[in-house]
């Protein structure tokens, strides 16, 4: 029985090490290649209360990834800009600004803007909107840029 427990512990440690290595490589790459990083200010601890999402969220280590981005940004003199979780990043057309409230459901992965006709992948569209919002937050109060 002890051999099996040791084997399972070894597998868990290997998975943890691989995940940490991956998170370090990705976070370092992002920080080195970008002067600012806009991220959605998700409350991971609240999301873990949803039992349907908890395992998936904890397995990808979102909060750990975010911590890595923040401390590496300080090391490299870069900025991490949190964007409010209430900002409708997935719902806004990144081309014209139209708000599609039907995109609230996570089942809808792709959508076409009825105003300008742009085709959107939910995640790519959200990332473009988060970038624009982060730029606005960074430049707020700067004459002529906000």
For each feature predicted by the language model, list its residue ranges.
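Positively charged, helix-rich recognition surfaces that bind polyanionic ligands
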Residues: 1-146
